[in-house]
Structures are given as structure tokens and as C-alpha cells.
């Protein structure tokens, strides 16, 4: 007959006890008082089996089993391309998208996922039942559809990609729709109209201004620079402006020096005194 070993690992079998400073857990230690640490732990360790140290055939906690993920048959799921996320089990913390899961509350992750997938597959099956297969149409209906598609005029791609700036002033599409947040020239000077009407007027004014600017090809000559006011007179003291050549003048008053500096020509200023 096999004997179960109930001795505690790391302690002697005759007088088991813990020494002061032991930081491990000793059950029921906090409910014992009036004795030393070694005596209390010795009594607890020598007590009935399972009181402080469970025997080998007993456990403190029941075995923990992980919850099973709900199993959904792969045949019910719609065909998918790429990753088969909908046909695989998920764990709590999954951040991917689960169809219909945002409408289910007060359940754990596995229950929400199972119910959401069942609802999604049911809705998908109903949609497929209402859709007729392509082979159900007669040849005449297919020919009519193809003929109708051929008769439809192609979209004007140039009109769709044309900018209101390049359109003619008489074009009815020369405006920006309400909600446009880009810059519209001359629009800030117009008021009292809807946004399409306002932008149409602004674009027309902008185009007229650009056309007038292109018409004037010859630039206007620049006006001659004005001559100094006090060209032939001396300046008053404390004048804060710039006087060309004044810093090279010495031995006179401010009025005399500025009169001499302003009266001399560039050639005279370059000649040595």
C-alpha cells in the first residue's frame, strides 16, 4: 500500500516550523497569538491535515478549467478572402471587428461573439435567398441590360475634373459648392448671397482682373525719386535723418556741415579736400 508523504518540503519531519523572517504564507497564522513565531507555526504545521499545509492528495483550490469558445460550423459562414477571422476562435481582448457585436450587451466576450456571429450568418443567408443567381436571367434580359449599358452616354470626365477657375464666365458650373473650405479670390469682399452665387461672382471678378492685367503689357515707368528737401540749406541740430557725406565733415556747425554735404556733388565728395 502506497503511503502518501505529507511532509513539508524544506522542513524537518520531526519538528517542522518556520523561523522569524519567513516571508511566505502560513494559513491561520494571523489568528494565533501569545506564542513565539516558531511555536505558532509549528503547531499549525503539525495540526490536522489540510489546516496549514495540504497533503499531496488534496488541493486548496478546485481545478480551473478555461472556458470553451463557442464553435460555429464553417459551412454556415459566408466565404471570405484573406484571413479567416470569422471562422476562428477569439480570446478576450481581441480588438478586431466582429459584425453585429456592437448591439449586444451584458454578456461575456465568448457569448457576445457567438451571438453576433449567429446573427450575422442568419442575415447573410437571408440576403442570399433574396438575390437571384446570374443564371436565372434569360438571355433576352441579359441582352437588354448590355444594350442599355451601351446606349448610356459616357460621363464627361473633363467636366468632372475641370476647375471652376478655368471655366468660362457663362458656364453654369463656375462656382464652388457650399462647404468648400479652400481659398476663393475676391470672395471676402462680397456679401448677401448664397455661397454658390457669391463664389461665381468672385471668380468672374478675379478673371476680369487677370485679363486686364494681361492687357497691359508695357510696364509703367517708375516715377523719379524726389530730391532732398534741404538740398541748398543746412539742417537744424538734432536732425535724426541720414545726411550723405556728413560724417566726413569737421570744423563747423551742424548747419554749415550739412549745407556743405548736401550741396556737394558725388564727384566733389570723392575728391580730396
UniProtKB/Swiss-Prot annotation:
Region (Disordered) residue spans: 59-85, 123-164
Entry's Gene Ontology BP terms: flagellated sperm motility
Ranges of biased composition (kind: Basic and acidic residues): 123-159
Pfam families on file: CMI2B-like
One GO cellular component term: axonemal A tubule inner sheath
Keyword Cytoplasm in annotation: yes
Keyword Oxidoreductase: no
Secretion signal, residue range per the UniProt entry: none
Tissue expression per record: Expressed in airway epithelial cells.
Chief location: cytoplasm
Subcellular location: Cytoplasm, Cytoskeleton, Cilium axoneme; Cytoplasm, Cytoskeleton, Flagellum axoneme
UniProt keywords, alphabetically: Cell projection, Cilium, Cytoplasm, Cytoskeleton, Flagellum
SUBUNIT field: Microtubule inner protein component of sperm flagellar doublet microtubules.
Family of this protein: Belongs to the CIMIP2 family.
Entry protein name: Ciliary microtubule inner protein 2B
Gene name tied to this protein: Cimip2b
Amino acid at each position: 500500500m502506497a503511503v502518501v508523504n505529507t511532509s513539508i518540503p524544506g522542513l524537518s519531519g520531526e519538528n517542522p516550523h518556520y523561523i522569524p523572517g519567513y516571508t511566505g504564507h502560513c494559513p491561520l497564522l494571523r489568528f494565533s497569538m501569545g506564542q513565539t513565531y516558531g511555536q505558532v507555526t509549528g503547531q499549525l504545521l503539525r495540526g490536522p491535515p489540510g489546516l496549514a499545509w495540504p497533503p499531496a492528495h488534496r488541493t486548496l483550490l478546485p481545478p480551473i478549467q478555461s472556458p470553451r469558445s463557442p464553435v460555429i460550423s464553417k459551412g454556415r459562414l459566408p466565404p471570405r478572402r484573406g484571413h479567416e477571422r470569422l471562422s476562428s476562435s477569439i480570446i478576450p481582448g481581441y480588438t478586431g471587428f466582429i459584425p453585429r457585436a456592437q448591439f449586444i450587451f451584458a454578456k461575456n466576450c465568448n457569448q457576445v461573439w457567438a451571438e453576433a456571429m449567429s446573427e450575422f450568418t442568419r442575415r447573410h443567408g437571408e440576403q442570399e435567398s433574396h438575390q437571384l443567381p446570374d443564371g436565372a436571367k434569360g438571355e433576352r434580359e441579359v441582352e437588354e441590360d448590355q444594350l442599355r449599358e451601351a446606349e448610356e452616354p459616357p460621363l464627361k470626365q473633363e467636366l468632372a475634373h475641370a476647375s471652376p477657375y478655368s471655366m468660362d464666365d457663362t458656364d453654369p458650373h463656375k462656382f464652388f459648392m457650399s462647404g468648400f473650405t479652400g481659398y476663393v479670390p475676391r470672395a471676402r469682399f462680397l456679401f448677401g448671397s448664397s455661397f454658390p452665387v457669391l463664389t461665381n461672382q468672385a471668380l468672374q471678378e478675379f478673371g476680369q482682373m487677370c485679363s486686364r492685367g494681361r492687357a497691359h503689357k508695357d510696364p509703367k515707368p517708375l516715377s523719379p525719386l524726389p530730391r532732398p528737401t534741404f538740398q541748398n540749406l543746412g539742417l537744424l541740430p538734432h536732425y535724426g535723418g541720414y545726411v550723405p557725406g556728413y560724417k566726413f565733415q569737421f570744423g563747423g556747425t551742424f548747419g554749415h556741415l550739412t549745407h556743405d554735404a548736401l550741396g556737394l556733388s558725388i564727384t566733389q565728395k570723392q575728391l580730396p579736400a
